[in-house]
């Protein structure tokens, strides 16, 4: 999160969902009167075109056509006792909004998760108890209307700034996944509860840069997953608004039969 983060995100205006790919019907009638084989289709959910933010804690998206649509609901599942959505000054609340810029070195705008501590005296460190870290976190849940396969996306802007924030991200799902940083990224960890994705060092990175990205790929069909965003920078400065934000890139996945 670089200094330009504030005032650069806007809520996505609602429009009819963009058809990212035509979806094959699970069972179509073949020319000989039999049942045609279902063919999975690769789809792309673009936040700027397919998503509607209904509040700072909820939104929804849909891709597909009139015959078959994949819907996604995004909801805040929980928030810690020392965490609020938006910034500390309460002048901006950009949680679950779509960025006004392309994120993480991609060509697409991203979905923001934006939060801040309520009290600086209750901030957590990486060595704090699990309970204290939970107070300084927010969990967002993603639910698809039906299982999708080969789901993949980036989490961008996982960075840190002294006396401000230190990003950590935990992913949980019944489906197995991998989460890792690529060449040139400073992100460490694998996204699990014991090894969260996290800033590899204290360095604020511009939101448009790919140097703080992690790639998440699900290895089996998935219906839902959750993402817990934590702050483990215990220090603070009264002159610094301690808000933090990460972004999700567009989602790519394949329909299932």
Enumerate the predicted regions with their spans.
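N-terminal secretory signal peptides and thylakoid transit peptides that target proteins
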Residues: 1-16
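C-terminal region of N-terminal signal peptides and the immediate post-cleavage residues
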Residues: 20-42
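N-terminal targeting leaders for non-cytosolic proteins
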Residues: 36-133, 172-194
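Short coil-to-beta strand junction motifs in C2/discoidin
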Residues: 89, 162-172, 241-246
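Short beta-strands within extracellular/lumenal beta-sheet-rich domains
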Residues: 129-145, 160-169, 209-216
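Extended extracellular/luminal ectodomain segments enriched in beta-structured repeat modules
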Residues: 144-152, 221-224
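A short beta-strand element within beta-rich, extracytoplasmic domains
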Residues: 148-162
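Terminal, low-complexity interaction segments
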Residues: 177-257
């Amino acid at each position: 999160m670089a200094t330009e983060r504030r005032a650069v995100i806007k809520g996505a205006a609602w429009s009819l969902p963009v058809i990212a790919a035509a979806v094959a019907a699970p069972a179509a009638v073949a020319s000989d009167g039999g049942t045609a084989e279902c063919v999975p289709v690769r789809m792309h959910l673009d936040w700027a075109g397919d998503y509607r933010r209904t509040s700072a804690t909820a939104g929804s998206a849909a891709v597909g056509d009139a015959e078959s649509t994949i819907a996604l609901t995004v909801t805040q599942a929980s928030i810690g006792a020392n965490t609020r959505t938006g910034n500390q000054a309460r002048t901006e609340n950009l949680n679950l909004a779509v960025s006004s810029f392309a994120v993480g070195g991609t060509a697409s705008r991203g979905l923001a998760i934006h939060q801040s501590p309520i009290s600086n005296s209750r901030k957590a460190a990486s060595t704090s108890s699990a309970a204290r870290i939970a107070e300084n976190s927010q969990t967002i849940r993603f639910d698809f209307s039906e299982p999708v396969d080969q789901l993949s996306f980036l989490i961008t802007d996982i960075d840190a700034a002294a006396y401000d924030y230190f990003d950590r991200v935990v992913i949980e799902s019944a489906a197995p996944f991998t989460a890792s940083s690529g060449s040139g990224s400073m992100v460490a960890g694998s996204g699990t509860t014991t090894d969260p994705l996290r800033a590899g060092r204290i360095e604020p990175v511009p939101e448009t840069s790919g140097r703080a990205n992690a790639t998440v790929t699900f290895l089996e069909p998935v219906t839902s997953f959750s993402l817990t965003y934590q702050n483990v920078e215990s220090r603070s400065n009264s002159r610094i608004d301690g808000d933090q934000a990460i972004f999700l890139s567009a989602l790519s996945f394949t329909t299932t039969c």
